[in-house]
């Protein structure tokens, strides 16, 4: 009997359900036209779950995710729930617990400038003439966001605050191995970002990355300090392939990479654990300002599904076909509002339709 791939679908809030409907079109094609044995189950998450079940991450949802091979996530949050205590708000009470529960230590953020969308980038045309395709790999469960002690105190009428950057060798080791392995599916280049001229945690980071690199002699390793890296990305993004970053530095640099592509509505992301179980979601948020207007760009959600197929299902050729269907519609001039220079653009459902048609026809 053929093993089924079990996918937990969590549409969430804001534009999440709208763009997820378009991802469903691709999922149905994978089932019906590509004959993939998919078992798809949908669960509540975020504000929608608060409204219907009283909590942002219901036990039923968590159990459904545990019984799945991957999670396809929409978005959570919105003004409606901003009056709740911060730890009960959709973002804090659903997405973060999911990451922790499944030990999703690696965040993958591709930032690709498609040649058809060069006009959207804030960079000069001579800099981006060849486009760029960067994969930012961010360590997600360690570093200064989770280090102890942390706090805010007052002594002798002087107020002060402090945080602690801690990295254990195994945390750096596993994220480094993943970066080198993924670079071998791309252009065999890893640039590790640190601040080893100042920080002890970065000194350890660089030492371990160098040791790990010896297992991958075919991959070229370079190092940059975070301050120089932010400048180099603006100067020549095409020089980079895989960026390997700590939690804090990856948080900064992945958003910079996203910005220079011109539209966050195009960008997917993945968070993986050591078993390649993953949570896949658009890099943007719930965008409540455009909710219900049928103008959200579904491409990031569709490309998030492509990443799920690539990394959790290990079906590279099919993932490539999904990616190519997106490129095909962009080459034909189809645009959503966020990437259009005029009022001639497709609605959310229309963009989903043309991508689905391109996938079926193999364009």
Swiss-Prot record:
Known cofactor(s): Mg(2+); Mn(2+)
UniProt: NAD(+) binding residues: 78-91, 285-297
Enzymatic reactions: (2R,3S)-3-isopropylmalate + NAD(+) = 4-methyl-2-oxopentanoate + CO2 + NADH
Any Gene Ontology CC annotation: cytosol
The protein's Enzyme Commission number: 1.1.1.85
SMART domains: Iso_dh
Entry keyword Cytoplasm: yes
Record GO terms (molecular function): 3-isopropylmalate dehydrogenase activity; magnesium ion binding; NAD binding
Binding locations of Mg(2+): 227, 251, 255
One matching Pfam family: Iso_dh
Keywords: Amino-acid biosynthesis, Branched-chain amino acid biosynthesis, Cytoplasm, Leucine biosynthesis, Magnesium, Manganese, Metal-binding, NAD, Oxidoreductase, Plasmid
UniProt function note: Catalyzes the oxidation of 3-carboxy-2-hydroxy-4-methylpentanoate (3-isopropylmalate) to 3-carboxy-4-methyl-2-oxopentanoate. The product decarboxylates to 4-methyl-2 oxopentanoate.
Protein name stated in the entry: 3-isopropylmalate dehydrogenase
Source organism per UniProt: Buchnera aphidicola subsp. Uroleucon aeneum
